[in-house]
């Protein structure tokens, strides 16, 4: 099982400048690159300081010049916010800029807050249908001379300009949860990204079950890869692990508030949650965070990840967005590289460079 970093700029208050947040994100990515991680994933969100990511291709183009080895993935682009011709062209250009290091993760999106602003009136079902129309369209645009007459987009014969460096196309990953989305991904030759969010390992097993069932259904198609994304913190003590659980408790309460889309937003920031509101949430308690997320000292984390490897996961993505300070994120990532990844033969870790200051 190989390892990757999943990272964004994240902001719950105006205490940090957005430039500082970006510089810190780049430094985390460079640590991942020097430390032997396989890939970096960064996504797309709009008008939300909670996750600042208006166009992942911009970040990836910058990272291509500031990293040397890692693959660079969109985690994810939101299909209904794009036109197929625009997505195909921007992705192909990014593949060229990155010298063929691009992976493309695609999702239907998750936040009604964004749907209301980007495609008013669209619901999650309709967003999913756009995803299903988008992926075959961009593949054909990369092949060239493709005419499209779909439910959501129509255009005459068109060829993506440019076309990607990787042929026939960069790897495509579908963010999947229910059985139908797994089947769509496998049937269309796409890899799969899954996350249990705040849920425990029962959900991790369930998601792998959906993937295996889809592979069994389409046995004539070569088995794609599957990536597991989890909030992760490698602690230096049990006390440190408990601090991380408390921090993730706060993070998930804000995540849930954004998802519900009922709270006032000012200057891209959600109205602060009170201690009482955070304490009252039944699903995101510190105890649940400590049990469900991958939090613990190195050996505990290794044991959890070995179980995921045994389930059949090809890649584990270290989700570092947690509301923690940059210093705590950095320390956890370095412990992941130096103390956890060497236990996995495919991680190809070069620990000598894991903590060297950024020099690119």
Curated annotation (Swiss-Prot):
Reaction catalysed by this enzyme: N-methylnicotinate + FMNH2 + O2 = (Z)-2-((N-methylformamido)methylene)-5-hydroxybutanolactone + FMN + H(+); N-methylnicotinate + FADH2 + O2 = (Z)-2-((N-methylformamido)methylene)-5-hydroxybutanolactone + FAD + H(+)
Annotated EC: 1.14.14.-
Keyword annotations of the record: FAD, Flavoprotein, FMN, Monooxygenase, Oxidoreductase
Presence of the UniProt keyword Ligase in the record: no
Coiled coil spans: none
Gene Ontology cellular component terms for the protein in this record: cytosol
EC category: oxidoreductase
Family the entry assigns: Belongs to the bacterial luciferase oxidoreductase family.
Function: Involved in the degradation of the pyridine ring of trigonelline (TG; N-methylnicotinate) into succinate and methylamine as carbon and nitrogen sources, respectively. Catalyzes the insertion of two oxygens, followed by a ring cleavage of trigonelline to yield (Z)-2-((N-methylformamido)methylene)-5-hydroxybutyrolactone (MFMB). It is able to use reduced FMN or FAD.
Protein's recorded name: Flavin-dependent trigonelline monooxygenase, oxygenase component
Organism lineage: Bacteria, Pseudomonadati, Pseudomonadota, Gammaproteobacteria, Moraxellales
Gene coding for it: tgnB
């Amino acid at each position: 099982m190989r390892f990757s970093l999943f990272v964004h700029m994240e902001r719950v208050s105006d205490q940090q400048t957005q430039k500082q947040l970006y510089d810190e994100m780049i430094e985390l990515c460079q640590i991942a690159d020097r430390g032997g991680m396989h890939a970096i994933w960064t996504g797309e969100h709009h008008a939300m300081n909670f996750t600042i990511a208006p166009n992942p291709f911009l970040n990836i183009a910058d990272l291509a010049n500031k990293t040397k080895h890692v693959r660079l993935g969109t985690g994810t682009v939101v299909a209904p916010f794009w036109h197929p011709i625009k997505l195909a062209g921007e992705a192909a250009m990014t593949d060229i800029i990155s010298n063929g290091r691009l992976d493309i993760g695609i999702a239907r999106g998750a936040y009604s807050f964004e749907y209301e602003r980007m495609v008013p009136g669209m619901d999650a079902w309709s967003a999913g249908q756009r995803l299903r129309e988008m992926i075959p369209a961009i593949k054909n645009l990369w092949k060239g001379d493709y005419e499209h007459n779909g439910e959501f987009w129509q255009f005459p014969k068109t060829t993506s300009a440019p076309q990607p460096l990787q042929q026939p196309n960069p790897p495509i990953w579908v963010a999947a949860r229910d059985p139908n989305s797994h089947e769509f991904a496998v049937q269309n030759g796409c890899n799969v990204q899954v996350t249990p969010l705040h849920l425990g390992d029962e959900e991790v097993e369930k998601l792998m079950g959906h993937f295996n069932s889809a592979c069994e259904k389409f046995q004539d198609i070569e088995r794609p890869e599957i990536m597991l994304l989890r909030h992760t913190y490698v602690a230096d003590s049990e006390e440190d692990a408990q601090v991380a659980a408390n921090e993730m408790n706060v993070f998930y309460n804000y995540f849930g508030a954004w998802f519900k889309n009922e709270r006032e937003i000012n200057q891209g920031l959600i109205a602060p949650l009170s201690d009482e509101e955070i304490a009252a949430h039944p699903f995101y308690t510190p105890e649940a965070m400590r049990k469900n997320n991958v939090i613990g000292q190195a050996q505990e984390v290794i044991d959890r990840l070995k179980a995921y490897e045994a389930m059949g996961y090809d890649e584990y993505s270290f989700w570092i967005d947690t509301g923690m300070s940059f210093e705590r994120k950095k320390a956890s990532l370095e412990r992941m590289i130096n103390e956890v990844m060497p236990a996995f033969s495919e991680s190809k870790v070069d620990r000598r460079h894991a903590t060297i200051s950024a020099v690119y």
